[in-house]
Amino acid sequence: MSRKLSDKEIDEKFEHLLSKGWSFSEDKIYIQKTFVFKNFKEAFSWMCRIAFIAEEINHHPNWANVFKTVDISLSTHDAGGLTELDLNFANKVELET
């Protein structure tokens, strides 16, 4: 199981993601972002690519898709907050976008 990061670690390690449109929940339990695509097909194709990454690293997002918009949030439930797994996953998501 991954260790929950401290607020200081979260601020340092996730800083670059904030400039890319990610935001924290008020309690810093999860990080979230909304992605908007050209159409549903592009949104769903992107979700499929992300699903393969999730399976590869065995870490799965909470997400919702409405037409061309995908809302994604990341948290490590077993740890009760953000961990290195969430940081790595968010970085991989950014590479696919």
Regions found by a protein language model. Name each.
Residues 1-97:
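Charge-rich alpha-helical segments
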